[in-house]
Amino acid sequence: MAAALLLLRALRQSPEPGPWRLWAQLSGRSPGLFSGAGGRRPYVVRGTPIGLAAAGGHTPQSLLLRILTPSFEGVSGLLLKRHIVPSAIRLWQLSGSTLYFNTSGLKQKNKDDDKPKGKAPEDDEEERRRKEREDQMYRERLRTLFIIAIVMSLLNSLSTSGGSISWADFVNEMLAKGEVQRVQVVPESDVVEVYLHPGAVVFGRPRLALMYRMQVANIDKFEEKLRAAEDELNIESKDRIPVSYKRTGFFGNALYALGMTAVGLAILWYVFRLAGMTGREGGFSAFNQLKMARFTIVDGKTGKGVSFQDVAGMHEAKLEVREFVDYLKSPERFLQLGAKVPKGALLLGPPGCGKTLLAKAVATEAQVPFLAMAGPEFVEVIGGLGAARVRSLFKEARARAPCIVYIDEIDAVGKKRSTSMSGFSNTEEEQTLNQLLVEMDGMGTADHVIVLASTNRADVLDNALMRPGRLDRHVFIDLPTLQERREIFEQHLKGLKLTQPSSFYSQRLAELTPGFSGADIANICNEAALHAAREGHTSVHTFNFEYAVERVIAGTAKKSKILSKEEQRVVAFHESGHALVGWLLEHTEAVMKVSIAPRTNAALGFSQMLPRDQYLFTKEQLFERMCMALGGRAAEAISFSRVTSGAQDDLRKVTRIAYSMVKQFGMAPSIGPVSFPEAQEGLVGIGRRPFSQGLQQMMDHEARLLVARAYRHTEKVLLDNLDKLQALANALLEKEVINYEDIEALIGPPPHGPKKMIAPQKWIDAEKEKQASGEEEAPAP
């Protein structure tokens, strides 16, 4: 604090503005002393200004120099050593110092030469403003250096303390070796301060720290304990350690705490003052960068990027967003009819369906600026940044209007605001959401700024965000249909080198992948190409796609996991039970492949089915799906008279289907045609249920009856076909993998007619037929 007061006093006495005058006054020299004599060329001053000052004397300036010189030199050396500042010249520039100094005569000559000749008044005003900005920058840099010097001085004073020691270390390492100079007792804190001789050797090394603190249990008997230790060490009376008592008192401690608090508050005030200078020249840009929205600008006029032709499928969604593109291209066509284009659109749908890809296509097709930003980038740990970034984003959008603002994963900032009854509240997120609502449809809303947002959690969005006037156009992007999957495969297969035309694979792959998203389809095509490259093929073949589909569905085969003979038999009968029940029942899907090879997704085996693109299910179809899922557990119980934990996933699926039939689909006669929302995982017990406890017990009872009836039916089917179950299990134990043709050869065709299937083996046969016509021969899978 004394150093700070002295520095301020010297600053007030400085005759001219600028930091170098201050350093010159503190050192007792004038700027002319550092220049060449007469008209000689000035030279660059090496070293710090404080380091050039005289160290002697007892003036306030010399005292301040002795305090601040080590700190300044330490900070300068650290910045240069760590390469934080590239050179000493740059360090002088940052600290506001002057590199070149002239004599007074040369300085006056330069002023005369630099006088403007025939300048306009506005040029003089601009020159005056430039000098004011430079002076402001100098003052801010000097204040920054002043704070660094004070902090380093405090740290330097604290560095003389060597920390805490124990009584044993004090006696054995210090007292016994004669390194203790004096001892000071602080009774109020039960602390003893031990001062050592300069150059003392402690723990085998010379120590720079000369003061150590020691906690004492009974401070009143410390001196008695010290004298007893000296007696044991045979220390003579003249060499005994002097003991003094330090009583600070209440006012001393209070003044010390008040002083440290004042220093901390002053530093905080200065930091926030710098933050308030953002936006003006001379201010620190770091605070301004925090408040700026980190968005990505896509210029659609360049023609580079994703177009609607590159987005396969999503026909209805593209029609919805094309209206925004048409409005931005030719708004007069809409305005002359009095139409108002929606302010924004919300893209909804499961993950991986192409919401972000569609937004990129809009950016290219609209040929207007496209400002994209992710929802999580708004909210930070510092309060108020989210709202500031929203304002910054829309300010930039208005300046570039007409334009499109795209917010990805808007659920990060658009969650429903908490009510007074709930204790889960996030003020920062709510403030960000409120600012977003105002910018989208508030008093200062500007036209020609369209907002697009995407999320896969529309249920958590605030109602005010979804109302007409904001995100009033809701575009739902569902999982692709069979035709859309074929188009997506065609799009991704264009970049692959194939043995057959892309149309040969696209239809079959689309039928193999019901329920797959666009991201899953892209992953399959990429995995097929990677597998072909690993195998050393020059093009992608059918079995590469077969491997890719199997890898995405069940994972890769884990050859390092070796099962015992008994476990292999259990897995074989388990998977055979699934396959046999699915083969014999009427409303089940075709079994494409059965494998007992362990997989990386923790599955010991799997049965690959070919589900249909179906949107309506009857009670009989759902019941037989439950029977097929229970086929593995029933086969284990029949074959081994015991069950294992391998059916855990099957039981989970059966339970979900049973409760859906009872609670949502109204398929339980005793419950009636009612439907209740599905309970969300992780929220059990939170909120009120829309049914009574008695009705809950009735639904539980109906679900148990439904599962029990499905299990009995599954057991009956397997008991009536034990020979077929045994044949399938033996084939699996022998080959590990069997397909549709193998099952048909073992147990005959399905009793309810052939099931629809797409066997990859037929693709290979088609390739072989083409090879016979003279084309390149495909390697064996």
Curated annotation (Swiss-Prot):
Record NCBIfam families: FtsH_fam
Protein name: Mitochondrial inner membrane m-AAA protease component paraplegin
Region (Disordered): 105-134
Catalytic residues as annotated in Swiss-Prot or TrEMBL: E575
HAMAP family for this protein: FtsH (MF_01458)
Chain positions with 3'-nitrotyrosine modification: Y505
Gene3D superfamilies reported for this sequence: 1.10.8.60, 3.40.1690.20, P-loop containing nucleotide triphosphate hydrolases, Peptidase M41
Cofactor annotation comment: Binds 1 zinc ion per subunit.
Transmembrane helix listed as a keyword: yes
GO molecular function: ATP binding; ATP hydrolysis activity; ATP-dependent peptidase activity; metalloendopeptidase activity; zinc ion binding
Membrane topology field: Multi-pass membrane protein
Transmembrane segments: 145-165, 249-269
Main location class: mitochondrion
Isomerase as UniProt keyword: no
Disulfide bonds: none
Record GO biological process: anterograde axonal transport; mitochondrial outer membrane permeabilization involved in programmed cell death; mitochondrial protein processing; mitochondrion organization; regulation of calcium import into the mitochondrion; regulation of mitochondrial membrane permeability
Subunit structure: Forms heterooligomers with AFG3L2; the m-AAA protease is composed of heterohexamers of AFG3L2 and SPG7. Component of the mitochondrial permeability transition pore complex (mPTPC), at least composed of SPG7, VDAC1 and PPIF. Interacts with MAIP1.
Location of the region described as Interaction with PPIF in the Swiss-Prot/TrEMBL record: 701-781
Annotated SMART domains: AAA
Cofactor(s) listed: Zn(2+)
EC number: 3.4.24.-, 3.6.-.-
UniProt subcellular location: Mitochondrion inner membrane
